[in-house]
A protein has these predicted regions:
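Structural/interface elements that position substrates and couple domains in central-metabolism enzymes
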Residues: 1-445
Length: 445
């Protein structure tokens, strides 16, 4: 039986693990398998990534080059653009992007492309796992029929499961091995074998009754966050209107030991999950005639935060008798969260675009991001790229306004407070001590 054969391969670590997509999810995953004794083949369409891995270099903050080098040198890890190597894998895990179309509908093209490559080269006796975030039903409605078209039967010829990735880039406390793993198969055998596989590298595995439960689990997690961040952002705007310190309110509320979980406002939401996942859930809801109002309201509030930040900047400049048009604006941090280089859906990009459209002279400093490019299709201002500027005293002193969009720890905020004439702090990066000792006009979210 396929279940018994795969179980034996997994337990004795002779199974070859294939991972399609070597980004923030796929690279840490395959390295973890290789460090635990498995042979891994990473599949990637980006030749530069393949070259870097082959040379023993990591391009992901959560994976050290030392670990990549070790896995490559001992023959456990190879990276390739040749998808025919899928035939040599006993397990194939899909870790590809799942973006949105311009219409905010799910873009399934990456999952479908990965499925088509598997379909070409699959053989009997393989376990396929989808980790990419998607709507409930994708695993059994999209992938299963593709594999069965080849004449293979579930449980007899292949197994199929979904296990949502839970990567938190730049979080050293939670890495692949200690983030609990939810696993749901299209069949009971699929669940059992997939759970066994992940138990080899993850401390805690939580099997569920179906792939759809696992798919819905991930969307529930991130929709919960998006909605609560939306509430925090709305409360911040209300507190500003009332002249109340938003951050002090949150700190006070967080002293309640039950029934409250602290969420914090910001310039908007970014990353590969929070801005996108609720749309997958609401899209699926619409297919069944269900109107997910909470999701829509949260998206409206969160997507409006960059414009609100620009409004704060405009008002602050007006207060010192300056217009946005022609003002020199310095953006501190363009990554979507601190201490990483990931700019996906970063609200800083929207803020830059809105300010450029109003005639501001924009520069940015981010120790992790050397260059920012803009998609012409989504840009209302200039679409020319920007390049990282060194954070010199003159740059801060000569800026009409400094906007803290991302609170990277490497930035010297004391120096910023000493030199910048006007600061808009969207992340509560400036302590009370720094604010009180500064001559700058400081506006906080």
């Amino acid at each position: 039986m396929i279940k018994n054969d795969l179980t034996e391969l997994i337990v004795d670590k002779s199974a070859c693990i294939g991972v399609i997509g070597l980004g923030y999810v796929g690279l840490p995953l395959i390295v973890e398998f290789c460090l635990n004794g498995y042979r891994g083949i990473g599949f990637e369409v980006d030749t530069k990534k393949v070259e870097q891995i082959t040379a023993g270099h990591s391009y992901i903050v959560d994976v050290t080059s030392e670990n990549v080098q070790q896995c490559v040198n001992n023959g456990k890890l190879t990276a390739t653009t040749d998808f025919s190597e899928l035939a040599n894998c006993d397990v194939i895990i899909i870790c590809v992007p799942t973006p949105l179309r311009k219409t905010k509908d799910p873009d399934m093209s990456y999952i479908i492309a990965a499925g088509e490559e598997i379909q070409k080269y699959m053989r009997r006796g393989q376990l396929m796992i989808l980790e990419s975030t998607t709507y409930p039903g994708t695993t059994d409605e999209v992938l299963q029929p593709m594999f069965e078209e080849k004449g293979f039967q579930l449980d007899e010829d292949f197994l199929l499961a979904f296990s949502p990735e839970r990567v938190d880039p730049g979080n050293p406390q939670y890495q692949t091995h200690n983030i609990p793993k939810v696993v749901g198969g299209v069949s009971d055998d699929s669940t059992e074998v997939a759970a066994l596989l992940y138990r080899q590298i993850v401390n805690e595995v939580h099997p569920v009754s179906s792939a759809r439960v696992a798919e819905a689990c991930k969307l529930w997690e991130n929709t919960f966050r998006a909605i609560n961040i939306g509430m925090a952002n709305e409360m911040a705007r209300l507190c500003n209107t009332l002249g109340i310190d938003t951050w002090e309110v949150v700190r006070a509320a967080a002293t309640k030991p039950f029934g409250f979980m602290a969420f914090y406002p910001g310039p908007g939401i970014g990353g590969h999950c929070i801005p996108l996942d609720p749309h997958y859930l609401s899209w699926k809801a619409r297919q069944h005639g269900f109107d997910s109002q909470f999701i829509s309201l949260a998206e409206q509030v969160n997507s409006g935060m960059p414009a609100y930040v620009v409004k704060l900047v405009s008002t602050a400049l007006n207060d010192v008798k300056k217009a946005v048009n022609g003002s020199k604006v310095l953006i501190l941090g363009v990554a979507y969260k601190k201490d990483i280089d990931d700019m996906r859906e970063s609200p800083a990009l929207s803020i830059i675009d809105l300010l450029r459209a109003r005639g501001a002279d924009l520069v940015y400093h981010d120790p992790f991001v050397p260059e920012v490019t803009f998609d012409h299709a989504y840009t209302i201002g200039e679409a020319e790229p920007l390049y990282n500027s060194e954070l010199t005293d003159d740059l801060m002193r000569n800026s009409d306004c400094v906007i803290i969009c991302t609170e990277h720890t490497d930035i010297d905020y004391r120096r910023v407070c000493e030199l910048a004439p006007l600061i808009v702090d969207t992340r509560n990066a400036l302590s009370a001590e720094l604010r009180n000792g500064s001559n700058a006009k400081i506006v906080r979210l």
